[in-house]
Amino acid sequence: NLKLTVDEKERLELKEYFISNTRIPSKYITLLDLAYDGNANRDFEIVTAELFKDIFKLQSKHMGGTRKPDILIWTDKFGVIADTKAYSKGYKKNISEADKMVRYVNENTNRNKVDNTNEWWNSFDSRIPKDAYYFLWISSEFVGKFDEQLTETSSRTGRNGASINVYQLLRGADLVQKSKFNIHDLPNLMQNNEIKFI
């Protein structure tokens, strides 16, 4: 007899919703599981990067590794430094993770090899305006005072950003596929709060 927790049951219902009502490939619907699996961080990063490329039709690159952001997302008009975190109980404010994002945003702004010899920022399109870079956290859900992490990161970098939970990420993918959201409007959603499509 399969005993499901309330959370697992809700996720199963969400998966069924996306399978029945969207054209999102099942590979991406598995993000609903990966986002809650603390042992699946790398898979979560890789599949999220592919979702941005395949469904959102943005340029994206999974970076991972030491002293690099998890994912870069861009067009020739804007760039996003994204950090993914798979947490079973949600992502709450975390000073060391905020410090890491601040470092990435500032490294991208300054673009000095002395700051980081791997020069990961060179993956971005060179045509992106200097003031059109944003930061983004992606996780299962955001709990506690995570909004403080957004406002503090913004005030420390002079850049805007956002967070998005995995359900909203898939809602956004569905809206893009149905031509109900123009992905070039993504920068308008970077208001230092959690993105909610619906």
Can you say where each PLM-predicted feature lies in the sequence?
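Nuclease-adjacent, charged terminal/linker segments that flank catalytic cores
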Residues: 1-9
